[in-house]
């Protein structure tokens, strides 16, 4: 299974994984959400971080507020425990992108980002980061210093092969390991994730009062 190969593809397993795509609308946010869920099914505590500060979608997938999030942590100094949302999917927690910012790349490459991910890695078994498409921005290359590797999403019959090769080469030159490629938009005979797909935009149920539960959970973890 994909989740098993991801966990054991590197010595010591994978702690922080980045999910990206070649181009927009290739299903990366849904893939990141699915990956968080299947890792949680193994009994792990997983934090899903929406670092696509250009076109955030994770809050839509889970049907949660985007008023506060990663930008609040990085630019405003808000405590992570105040923005981490505990979803009704056991073991899955979310940090949405939060308010718009004029300079996403500067925030993602900041010392505050490094400190936040170090804190997240210390309190969760896995951290899954949804980032912008590689050919849209250079943001994903910033995560080469943070992540154990990248899962690259492509869309069947849509993503040009030459652009897939371009992205592969760009990631490897940037020192970002590629853990695997997910082909979206193709009907498979078996459940690729051993778990039904969340369609892009389909909402996973959230808790009735996620902010309160999130603060309590984060406090317990610290």
Q: What does each model-identified segment do?
A:
Residues 1-222:
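P-loop NTP-binding module
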């Amino acid at each position: 299974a994909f989740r098993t190969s991801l966990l054991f593809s590197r010595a010591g397993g994978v702690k922080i994984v980045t999910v990206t795509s070649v181009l927009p609308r290739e299903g990366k946010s849904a893939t990141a959400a699915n990956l968080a869920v299947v890792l949680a099914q193994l009994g792990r505590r997983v934090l899903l971080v929406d670092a696509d500060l250009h076109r955030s979608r994770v809050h839509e997938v889970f049907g949660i507020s985007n008023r506060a999030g990663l930008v609040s942590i990085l630019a405003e100094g808000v405590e992570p425990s105040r923005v981490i949302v505990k979803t009704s999917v056991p073991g899955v927690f979310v940090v949405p992108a939060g308010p718009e910012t004029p300079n996403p790349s500067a925030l993602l490459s900041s010392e505050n980002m490094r400190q936040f991910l170090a804190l997240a890695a210390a309190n969760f078994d896995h951290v899954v980061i949804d980032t912008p498409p590689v050919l849209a921005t250079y943001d994903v290359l910033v995560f080469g210093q943070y992540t154990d590797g990248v899962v690259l999403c492509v869309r069947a019959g849509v993503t040009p092969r030459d652009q897939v090769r371009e992205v592969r080469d760009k990631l490897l030159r940037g020192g970002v390991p590629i853990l695997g490629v997910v082909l979206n938009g193709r009907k498979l005979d078996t459940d690729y994730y051993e778990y039904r797909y969340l369609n892009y935009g389909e909402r996973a149920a959230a808790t009735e009062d996620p902010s309160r539960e999130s603060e309590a959970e984060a406090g317990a973890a610290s």
